[in-house]
Amino acid sequence: MQALIKQIREHLDMSQTELAERLNVSFATVNRWENGRAVPNKLAQTKLYEICKENAVSVYDIILEKIANAADSILLSKGRVLLYHGSKSGIEGKIEPKSRSQCDFGKGFYMGTDPSQALTLICDYDKSKFYIVSVDTADLNLIEVPADIEWAMFVAYHRGRMEIIKGTSLYEKYRKMSENKDIVIGSIANDRMFYVIDNFFIGNITDAALVGCL
């Protein structure tokens, strides 16, 4: 937080004294924020955000720039990839598959290649944490699911939309699709895609229409 506040102040081209006056706090308060000895409360954060808006300073872009710089500083050995994860309350202990079972690819630990996606999921939570994760994929069992009809059915299975055909060969196909896999690689379904999948399973659209929406 302290580094972010300093970056914002520099983008605003203000001294600590000038920023303190705009926020109606003391110079010492801003100094403590930037030295990491204190954290601005909600009111101060809101005021700071409003000042940024008034001066066309994008806090979002500053955060993404900070993430990009941190990612660029990480040296990756062969077989390693950088991924991003957002947690609403932070990770304690070992990384474990603690998500809800009815997520797109089932219960797991979700990471992505786009930092903005992880940020979007946690931006409204006070205790949220953002992680850059280095993953060694060399000895892992992976499955990549392209954004096609197979992907839509795979997501539909994990979202519980296939329970009406439970026990059929089609159901079993997607139940076993990621069995014994360490990592599933694929796109995450947005709200529009959930709507399309739901309409397919209740018979409102054809399989051709479903494919056309992918």
List the predicted regions and their residue ranges:
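Short polar catalytic/cofactor-binding loops
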Residues: G86-G93
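Short basic helix-loop element that most often maps to the first helix and adjoining turn
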Residues: A3-R22
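ADP-ribosyltransferase catalytic core
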Residues: I67-S73, K78-R80, E96-K107, T113-R175
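Beta-strand-enriched accessory nucleic-acid recognition/scaffold domains that flank the catalytic cores
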Residues: M1, E10-H11, Y49, E54, ...
